[in-house]
Design a protein with these regions (language model features):
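Outer-membrane beta-barrel translocator/pore domains, especially the C-terminal barrels
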Residues: 1-127
């Protein structure tokens, strides 16, 4: 059974990701920054998702990651602990994704695209 046969959508998404090398400070702090540029080109016909005319959006996300690698060596064990802090900024107006069922879990919390959105980035600032 065919549904919505008159609905046409097309999108082309380009991502440019840059991660700097880790910088180690004298006090043991490790820091680096990430830059994510997303170019979304889209057009649609008879759809509420995309506009009828071609749209091009350029979005960016800046992330500054800081961590303090700690270790403790005993005669029997070697323990490590690495507290992390991630500062993020996405200064552009993004799509409203509150209705999507995206969840951040332990494995994705420090990823640059942690919500795994194709056509948008996480909006605002976060720590």
């Amino acid at each position: 059974m065919l549904n919505n046969t008159n609905v046409l959508t097309s999108s082309l998404i380009n991502d440019l990701k840059y991660t700097s090398l880790a910088n180690f400070f004298d006090n043991g702090i490790k820091a680096n920054f990430d830059l994510l540029l997303k170019n979304v080109n889209s057009v649609g016909k008879n759809t509420t998702v995309y506009k009828n005319s071609p749209q091009s959006e350029l979005m960016s996300q800046y992330t500054y990651n800081v961590s303090l690698p700690l270790s403790k060596k005993t005669p029997r064990t070697f323990n490590t602990l690495e507290p992390k802090l991630s500062l993020r900024l996405s200064p552009h107006e993004m799509k409203n994704n509150t209705d999507t069922s995206r969840r951040i879990n332990v494995n994705s919390i420090f990823l640059s695209d942690r919500l795994n959105l194709d056509n948008s980035l996480e909006t605002g600032e976060s720590i």
